[in-house]
Amino acid sequence: MSGIKFYLVKGTALFGESHYPEKRKFVKIVRALNEKQAIEYVYSHFGSKNKIKRYNIKIEQISEIKEEEIPDRRIRELAKVDKIIM
């Protein structure tokens, strides 16, 4: 059984499709079991937060990265957490 991996997803998305469409580049670090789940997470995240349709999101590159290569310190620290108690 494979563990959770980190993926660096790069691409472009069309923001504001109805009013003033603007194509923007994005880079997102995603925790997932495989590439397919990482892509699905990106689609669902942009769809729910920014109301962007899946056909307006173009993923150009997806690559697996090591925990040490993550640029954001907060994400690196959260990766070390084994369990969360609420």
Curated annotation (Swiss-Prot):
The keyword Protease does not apply. GO terms for biological process: translation. Gene3D superfamilies: 3.10.20.10. The keyword rRNA-binding applies. It comes from the Archaea. Keywords: Ribonucleoprotein, Ribosomal protein, RNA-binding, rRNA-binding. One of its GO terms (molecular function) is large ribosomal subunit rRNA binding. This is Large ribosomal subunit protein eL20. It comes from Saccharolobus solfataricus (strain ATCC 35092 / DSM 1617 / JCM 11322 / P2). The lineage of its organism: Archaea, Thermoproteota, Thermoprotei, Sulfolobales, Sulfolobaceae. The gene is rpl18a.
